[in-house]
Structure formats: structure tokens, C-alpha cells
């Protein structure tokens, strides 16, 4: 329900997907221009989108509770506190320490924290603690977490699952690109908490497979990206269906005027916590702008990809991602592509291969720019510079997470330099700028670049051995003589494998 009047000028949202083609690349031709999308030539010299100033944050009428020093100081179920200990989570991050005392008390929360700052537990623990002990009816969840992408939905669900189990809450993930039948079954069986992308949740509601009138706690994670991706009409339509007077929590890495509509319309006397500067700067992150000649960029990219260690490389278009990935594989670099043109099972498999080290280079469009956490990732490379300072911050947010160190490297050709200077200024970042050439010490020192082996590689799915299942119907029955004779062979094989 609308709590305050809204301003129509904030209801106009940007169109298009974060994964849509945005120009050409040295690794692929220009993607077809979508309706309403500005024309760009060659993918170089593009003018960044003008940075939007942050809106005036709402004033808190009711005083907020002070931050806590430890989880034990919070009014949470003992099972949740025990689960935190078993997961090795002992000290709250700043955004958790600041918001949890208020969210646990049922206050609306507007929180800003950089990517990797611990936002998931900041809202997740409060939602689980306040929902614990309740039981959802079929198709009627009690808590809702809205996120912009499938990858972020899966990461949020994975992060919260052990805590949900500790308080006997059922959690369902509702996203596009996956079996809708399984999601329907999960909702029919009863799920107290649903993590969802707006489009698939709307589809399920339209089918009659989900209702939101019992949702008492609603979370919007990465609200600014949902606005940027054109999801605002769907998001507001969903929020209008949840229980009136319920708790709302909005978390994001940036809070610009695209989010103002949601704050004005759905948050009531919110507690505002901003634990990071507006630019999202991270002290453990280094920013490098590498000036390269256009003719040298292709080779420089290949040498960086051949480094020892993992790296995420961002390009603008799906076609460019596929072209670069094919080139790297032919050059002897274990690379995999990630973009919106891949099916969800393919994307999940690729991320697993990257996280486990089966592939060293993840070549991606902005589909990977949010919600993907990879431990010990120390390098992100913008092969194609982003056109928006928020995209830059969220691409870079894949490294230097949770106090770790990392570097963000952007390859810039001569005709891109002016635009890159503007973008960095909008992001509040002063990068280290270096002129580099392939094979030179500066490129090796900053990125670990080295010549690839030149021996083509093929990435295959890792073989996972599964234990043989014994048929339940054979219990208490005499096996045929042929089966009995084969039994020692199977036993011997299993023993050898062990």
C-alpha cells in the first residue's frame, strides 16, 4: 500500500537490460541497436551516462538504536546465534552492526553499503529472526526478498539457507530460466521465505501459484540496479500486494534518484544507515587505468588472461564475450563465457567451474557485475570500459570483498581517455594511470600478464562420482545367482576406488 504520496517524475524508469549489447568490441562486431537505445560507433569513444546525484536521504523521526559490538548483543533466537558460530561468522560487519538492532525491532531500514560489505546477513538475519516460529500456508510466503538477477538470487539463497534451517524455516528461490514446475511445487508445499526476481514472481502470481498478502517483511536488495534495468513498474506492482503496514528494508550499494520513488512510497520513518561513502570506495582496492594503443589491446588482454590466478574480464556485448572466450581457449587459456544468452544451468555450471578453479578466466557482460562472490579474486579487468560510474563500481565490487585486497584494471584506448576521466570523477576515484605495451614490465607488474602457452585447451565438465543407490525393493529378497556372483566384483571395485 502507498504510505505517502509519490512524485510522478520519479516513476519514469530506464529501459533495457544490463546485459543488452552496448556497442562493439575488438572481439566482436557491434550488436544490433535496440529500440530506444542510443547509437554508438565501434564501442570506442562512448560518452558515459551522466551521473545522477544522490537524493536527499529521508530524516529519521524516531531515534535509531545504537550499533552493537557483537551478535550476542542482539535479540535473536539462540539457534541463529549458534548457526553464526558454526559458519565462522563471529564479528558483525559495520552495516550489520548498525542495522540489525533496528531491523530486529521491526523498523523500516534504508541501508547503503558497498558490494561485499555484508548486506545479505544484515537483512537476512532480521527477516529470519522475526519470522522464526511461524508456518506459511501453501502459496502464501511470510517474507520476501526481491533481487534484480538470477545469480544474486542464488547467492542470497545459498547464504541464508543454513540460517533458515537452524530456525526451521523453508526458503524457496523463484527466478526465470529455471524450472517453473519445481518453483510451483516449493510454493505449494509452503515456504516461509521467498527469494525472487520480479519477472518470475509476477508470472507465478498471475498463474495463481503465489500470493503476497501474508508477506509481513519485504526486502529490496540492489534496488538501484532494479531501477536501472527497468524493473520499477514490476517492483512497485509487487510491493503494492504485500501486507499493509509490514516491515520494509531497502539495501543498495548506491542510492541515486532512481531509488527515490521506492523510498518515498514504501518506507515509513526509516532508519537510515550509510556505512560507506557515496562513491563506494574501498580502501583495499587499487584502481588502474592502463592506456593502450588500439592495435595492442587484443594482445594485452590475452597476456593478462594468461596470468597465474583467476580474473574476471568484462566486455559490453554477448558476441564480444563469446569471441574473446574462443580466442583465449585457442591460445591456451582456460576461459569460460558468462552472459544473458546462456541458459541458467549453463551459467550456474560456469560459475561453479570458476569458483572451484576449473577455469581461470571468467569473460562476462554485466550479468556478472552484481551478486557474484568468489573468494580470493584479486583482479577484475574492464576490457571494454563501462559507460556508467555505477557499473564501474559494481564490476569492481567482485574483488576486494569483505576486507580482502584486489585491483580493478581498465584498458583505455586514446579516444576513450576523456570519457574515462569523467567516469572516474563521477565515481569519486583517482586511479593510477599507466601507459603500457605488451611484453613490458609495467603490464606484468600491475596485472601479472604473461605470454600464453599457445596450446589450445578444451573445458570439460568435471567428473563427479556418485555413490550407487541400492534398490529399496531388493531388501529381504534373495538375489538371483548371477547377481550374487557379480557382487564380489562390485565390492572389489568399490574398495579399490576408496
Where are these regions (language model features)?
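General helical secondary-structure elements
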Residues: 1, 5-10, 18, 22, ...
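N-terminal intrinsically disordered, low-complexity tails of helicases
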Residues: 1-98, 316, 497-498
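Non-catalytic, charged low-complexity extensions flanking SF2 helicase motor domains
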Residues: 2, 430-498
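Intrinsically disordered, low-complexity segments enriched in polar/charged small residues
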Residues: 8-10, 14-19, 27-31, 37-39, ...
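A generic alpha-helix propensity feature with a strong bias for hydrophobic helices
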Residues: 35, 41, 51, 61, ...
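Conserved helicase RecA-like core
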Residues: 66-455, 490
Amino acid at each position: 500500500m502507498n504510505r505517502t504520496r509519490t512524485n510522478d517524475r520519479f516513476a519514469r524508469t530506464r529501459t533495457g537490460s544490463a546485459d543488452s549489447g552496448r556497442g562493439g568490441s575488438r572481439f566482436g562486431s557491434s550488436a544490433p541497436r535496440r529500440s530506444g537505445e542510443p547509437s554508438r560507433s565501434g564501442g570506442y569513444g562512448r560518452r558515459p551516462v551522466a551521473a545522477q546525484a544522490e537524493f536527499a536521504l529521508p530524516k529519521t523521526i524516531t531515534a535509531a538504536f545504537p550499533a552493537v559490538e557483537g551478535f550476542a548483543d542482539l535479540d535473536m533466537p539462540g539457534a541463529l546465534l549458534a548457526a553464526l558460530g558454526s559458519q565462522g561468522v563471529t564479528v558483525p560487519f559495520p552495516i550489520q552492526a548498525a542495522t540489525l538492532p533496528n531491523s530486529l525491532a521491526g523498523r523500516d531500514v534504508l541501508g547503503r553499503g558497498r558490494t561485499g560489505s555484508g548486506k545479505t546477513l544484515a537483512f537476512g538475519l532480521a527477516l529470519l529472526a522475526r519470522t522464526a516460529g511461524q508456518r506459511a500456508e501453501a502459496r502464501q510466503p511470510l517474507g520476501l526478498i526481491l533481487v534484480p538477477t538470477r545469480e544474486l538470487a542464488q547467492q542470497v539463497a545459498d547464504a541464508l539457507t543454513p540460517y533458515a534451517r537452524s530456525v526451521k524455516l523453508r526458503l524457496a528461490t523463484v527466478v526465470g530460466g529455471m524450472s517453473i514446475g519445481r518453483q510451483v511445487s516449493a510454493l505449494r508445499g509452503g515456504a516461509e521465505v521467498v527469494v525472487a526476481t520480479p519477472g518470475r514472481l509476477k508470472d507465478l502470481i498471475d498463474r495463481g501459484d503465489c500470493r503476497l498478502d501474508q508477506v509481513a517483511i519485504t526486502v529490496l536488495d540492489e534496488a538501484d540496479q532494479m531501477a536501472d534495468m527497468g524493473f520499477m513498474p514490476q517492483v512497485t506492482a509487487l510491493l503494492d500486494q504485500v501486507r499493509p503496514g509490514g516491515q520494509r528494508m531497502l539495501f543498495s550499494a548506491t542510492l541515486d534518484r532512481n531509488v527515490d520513488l521506492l523510498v518515498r512510497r514504501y518506507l515509513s520513518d526509516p532508519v537510515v544507515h550509510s556505512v560507506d561513502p557515496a562513491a563506494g570506495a574501498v580502501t583495499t582496492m587499487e584502481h588502474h587505468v592502463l592506456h593502450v594503443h588500439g592495435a595492442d589491446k587484443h594482445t594485452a588482454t590475452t597476456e593478462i588472461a594468461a596470468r597465474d590466478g583467476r580474473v574476471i574480464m568484462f566486455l559490453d556485448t554477448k558476441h564480444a564475450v563469446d569471441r574473446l572466450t574462443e580466442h583465449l581457449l585457442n591460445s591456451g587459456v582456460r576461459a569460460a563465457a558468462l552472459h544473458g544468452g546462456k541458459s541458467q544451468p549453463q551459467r550456474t555450471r560456469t560459475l561453479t567451474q570458476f569458483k572451484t578453479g576449473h577455469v581461470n578466466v571468467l569473460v562476462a557482460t554485466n550479468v556478472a557485475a552484481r551478486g557474484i562472490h568468489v573468494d580470493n579474486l584479486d583482479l577484475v579487468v574492464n576490457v571494454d570500459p563501462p559507460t556508467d560510474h555505477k557499473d564501474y563500481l559494481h564490476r569492481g565490487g567482485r574483488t576486494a570483498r569483505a576486507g580482502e585486497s584486489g585491483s580493478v584494471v581498465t584498458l583505455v584506448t586514446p579516444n576513450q581517455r576523456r570519457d574515462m576521466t569523467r567516469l572516474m570523477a563521477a565515481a569519486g576515484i583517482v586511479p593510477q594511470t599507466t601507459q603500457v605495451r605488451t611484453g613490458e614490465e609495467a603490464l606484468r607488474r600491475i596485472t601479472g600478464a604473461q605470454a600464453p602457452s599457445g596450446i589450445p585447451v578444451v573445458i570439460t565438465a568435471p567428473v563427479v562420482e556418485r555413490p550407487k543407490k541400492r534398490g529399496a525393493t531388493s531388501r529381504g529378497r534373495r538375489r538371483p545367482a548371477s547377481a550374487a556372483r557379480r557382487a564380489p566384483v562390485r565390492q572389489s571395485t568399490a574398495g579399490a576406488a576408496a
